Curated annotation (Swiss-Prot):
Residues 29-50 have a biased composition (Basic and acidic residues). Residues 51-60 have a biased composition (Basic residues). InterPro entries: UBact. It comes from the Bacteria. This is Prokaryotic ubiquitin-like protein UBact.
Length: 60
């Protein structure tokens, strides 16, 4: 079995490819998380039993 080759390591930390301030690529939109109370109220209107199961799973 051939020996493994080792590559030289660098002292620089790993960074994301877009960390350099590059504005050319797509980026995820900055949106706030939906309020879980509103979600539960909407679920209650559609299917009360499903809302109860979701509430038990999510710990609310």
């Amino acid at each position: 079995m051939p020996e493994r080759k080792t590559q030289p390591t660098t002292d620089q930390p790993w960074t994301k490819p877009n960390d350099g301030g590059d504005e050319s690529g797509p980026r995820s939109p900055e949106v706030e998380r939906p309020n879980t109370r509103d979600l539960l109220e909407r679920m209650k209107r559609v299917d009360p039993r499903q809302a109860r199961r979701y509430r038990q799973r999510s710990g609310e």
